[in-house]
């Protein structure tokens, strides 16, 4: 029988003399890892499909029956989210077969959390999208007096909306979105 040391040295020598074998092993490993990741993502999407696409607490634009649904997790103080908003609007206007579901994901601090709560609290008044647009179109962070002004600009009582935004249903919704993300 061949000793373990001798076998190890033979394998090492072979790999050093044939580096293409290691490249092939690396390539196959990459393919395997990518396939496993895609499988995991697919399973996650199936498991969370209703929470992603059909949560009645979320606001969406486009036909509910659209064959294509985009789910956007966003923060009102995220510069990338603000820059993407006009493109998302153009996409939905030019493509009636696209629906966008908006998921408040306030991760950039207390001002983000308050903005998300205000937007969600305004949904019952039919003003969610107007507030949403105002927050995403604003330069920089919107909080304090600027947030109150935005709320009142759309015919709502700022103190009432801020208070409504602090309820347990909105707490649960934001928590659920964070867990989903």
Language-model-detected regions and their locations in the chain:
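Cysteine-centric redox/oxidoreductase cores and disulfide-bonded domains
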Residues: 32-35, 106-181
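Extracytoplasmic thiol/disulfide redox context detector
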Residues: 1-110, 166, 170-181
């Amino acid at each position: 029988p061949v000793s373990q040391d001798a076998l190890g040295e033979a394998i090492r020598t072979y790999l050093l003399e044939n580096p293409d074998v290691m490249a092939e092993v690396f390539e196959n490993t990459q393919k395997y890892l990518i396939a496993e990741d895609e499988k995991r993502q697919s399973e996650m999407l199936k498991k969370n499909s209703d929470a992603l696409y059909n949560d009645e607490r979320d606001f969406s634009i486009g036909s509910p029956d659209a064959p294509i649904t985009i789910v956007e997790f966003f923060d009102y103080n995220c510069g990338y989210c603000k820059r993407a908003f006009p493109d998302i609007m153009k996409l939905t206007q030019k493509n009636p077969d696209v629906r966008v579901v908006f998921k408040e994901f306030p991760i950039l601090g207390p001002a983000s959390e308050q903005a998300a709560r205000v937007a969600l609290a305004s949904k019952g008044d039919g003003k969610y999208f107007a507030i949403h647009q105002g927050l995403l179109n604003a330069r920089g962070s919107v909080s304090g007096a600027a947030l109150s002004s935005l709320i009142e600009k759309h015919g709502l009582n700022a103190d009432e909306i801020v208070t409504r935004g602090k309820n347990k249903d909105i707490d649960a919704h934001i928590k659920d979105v964070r867990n989903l993300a």
